[in-house]
UniProtKB/Swiss-Prot annotation:
InterPro entries attached to this UniProt entry: Fol_N, Prespore_vesicle_assoc
Any single GO CC term annotated in Swiss-Prot or TrEMBL for this entry: spore wall
Compositionally biased region (Polar residues): 285-297, 480-508
Residue ranges that the Swiss-Prot or TrEMBL entry lists as coiled coil: none
SMART domains from the UniProt entry: FOLN
Lineage: Eukaryota, Amoebozoa, Evosea, Eumycetozoa, Dictyostelia
GO molecular function, one term: cellulose binding
Protein name (Swiss-Prot/TrEMBL): Prespore vesicle protein
Signal peptide: 1-18
Annotated spans, Disordered: 285-514
Biased composition (Low complexity): 328-391, 398-413, 424-457
Originating species: Dictyostelium discoideum (Social amoeba)
One example of a Gene Ontology biological process annotation: sporulation resulting in formation of a cellular spore
Length: 514
């Protein structure tokens, strides 16, 4: 019964529809194939078999039903293509299903119209006079802007920091200030990506940039656009610790919004110590060069100003000093004149010998005394008789023969004095390296030697070495004292324990006696 009633209703509805279509007048002329005019529905024309309805402030064509002109509608226009039932839009062909042809920026374009079956705008439909735009990652309805001759992006004019992109069929100026992802159909867009409808499917696309995005300039990804006066300029972006590159020994910190590379405190202290060590070493080397030049100049003075005879005499006397033979000392004493030899023996008192020993003991090191050319000159002047006699072995024998009468009576004194002088010379003699430069530093050299000059100032390296040696010696002394104290404490503990043990042993004996 129900199926029968339903079939009757369908038959009645079909008969009414056919009658209504036959009674519709599409203007002048016959059917669609002969160029009949359709009903203007908003900004487009509905084909035959469709109904023009108003939804959410927009005129849309519904397939089937009655074709009625809405209030305020206008009839007119000619469809092209005959039975295609679609209008050519801008010379590019007919629009797709769900699109309508409209003018944007003075040109006809196919755009999607929002209806209850079409794309929504952020979960809602836009009213008449509004367009759907993407702002800060959120779809929303905004008023359709008035057409402007200055527009550079459809009906809009994009600023230097905006992107021109098509959203829902409209060219729009957009920029992304957010960083949170947002939903786009079945996808998730990440700024600066934008959500657009492509082929009836919402997709995430990257925004195209205009040629000049900073006034009349173009800023790349490493620069940012700032306003300066009446114009715009591209300046480098402020780096963060994520983009700034530091060396291996440095770390990145943010200071007043800028990323800076610094050295950690521990590494900085170590680097300061290394730099101080290098500075001290360089200063020591710089100070050591003038001292070496001064010493070399002082050593070179006697050789430059000295006479050839004196230089030869010094070389002759250097050889016996290296060999240090006692015979040469005896020969020197024998070659001395009889009067001088006797006077030397008479005045060689113990007090003078002691004074000579004290003078030699308080003498400066060889490194300081080597830089005294005066001693060499005095030594050479007083050693002239020995130099002349040493160069003539024949005169040496003659001198011995002629000196026999004078030395015959003084033989005991000479023999007694010889061992003492020879031993004193050997005891107070300096190392061979130093005595080689001073062959005749015997009684004559010691008597006529001038007072020692003040020692040269120590360099920083020598001072540091002396301080290091002093600290090592002090540390060794303290360690030795601690060791001695430990030994004493151990001995005292041992004695105390022995006394306590002896007392404990003595107590039972006294108790037994009692």
């Amino acid at each position: 019964m129900r199926l029968y009633l339903l079939s009757l209703i369908l038959v009645f509805y079909a008969s009414v529809s056919s009658a209504s279509l036959d009674s519709v007048n599409f203007g002048r002329g016959g059917g669609w194939g002969s160029g009949n005019q359709g009903v203007l529905c908003g900004t487009h024309y509905c084909p035959p078999g469709s109904t023009c309805e108003s939804k959410h402030g927009h005129y849309i064509c519904r397939p089937g039903g009655l074709i009625t002109a809405p209030s305020g509608g206008d009839s007119g226009g000619i469809w092209t293509g005959g039975d295609k039932h679609k209008k050519d839009c801008g010379g590019t062909g007919c629009c797709k299903e769900g699109q309508y042809c409209t003018k944007l920026d003075g040109k006809e374009q196919c755009v999607y119209y929002p209806d209850d079956k079409g794309p929504q705008c952020g979960g809602s439909f836009c009213r008449e006079g509004e367009i759907c735009v993407l702002e800060h990652g959120v779809l929303g309805c905004l008023e359709n802007p008035v057409e402007d001759s200055k527009a550079n992006c459809g009906l809009f004019h994009c600023n230097y920091n905006e992107y021109c992109i098509m959203v829902n069929g409209y060219l729009q100026c957009l920029f992304s200030n957010g960083t949170a992802p947002f939903a786009c159909g079945l996808q998730t867009c990440v700024p600066p990506q934008l959500c657009v409808k492509v082929e009836n499917c919402q997709q995430c696309v990257s925004p195209p940039r205009p040629d000049n995005n900073c006034g009349d300039k173009y800023c790349d990804d490493e620069h940012q656009c700032v306003r300066k006066g009446l114009g715009y300029e591209c300046i480098p972006k402020r780096l963060t610790c994520e983009t700034k590159k530091c060396e291996a020994s440095q770390v990145c910190i943010m200071v007043n919004g800028d990323a800076q590379c610094i050295v950690p405190p521990a590494a900085a202290a170590a680097e300061i110590r290394i730099n101080n060590f290098r500075f001290n070493r360089n200063s020591v080397q710089r100070n050591a060069k003038p001292a070496q030049q001064q010493r070399s100049a002082q050593h070179a003075k006697p050789a430059q100003h000295g006479k050839p005879a004196q230089h030869a005499t010094q070389q002759q006397h250097a050889k016996p000093a290296q060999n240090a033979k006692p015979v040469q000392h005896n020969a020197q004493q024998q070659h001395a004149k009889p009067a001088q030899h006797a006077a030397q023996q008479q005045h060689a008192k113990p007090a003078q010998h002691v004074a000579q020993q004290q003078q030699q003991q308080h003498a400066k090191p060889a490194a300081h005394t080597a830089a005294k050319p005066v001693q060499h000159n005095a030594q050479q002047q007083h050693a002239k008789p020995a130099a002349h006699t040493a160069a003539k072995p024949v005169q040496h024998n003659a001198a011995q023969q002629h000196a026999k009468p004078a030395a015959h009576g003084a033989k005991p004194a000479v023999n007694a004095a010889r061992p003492v002088q020879h031993n004193a010379a050997q005891q107070h003699a300096k190392p061979a390296a130093h005595t080689a430069a001073k062959p005749v530093q015997h009684n004559a050299a010691q008597q006529h030697a001038k007072p020692a000059a003040k020692p040269a100032k120590l360099t920083n390296a020598q001072k540091l070495q002396q301080e290091h040696q002093r600290q090592e010696a002090l540390a060794k002394q303290q360690a030795r004292i601690r060791q001695q104290n430990l030994v004493k404490q151990a001995a005292q503990k041992k004695q105390t324990s022995q006394r306590a043990a002896s007392k404990n042993q003595a107590r039972p004996a006294t108790q037994k006696r009692n």
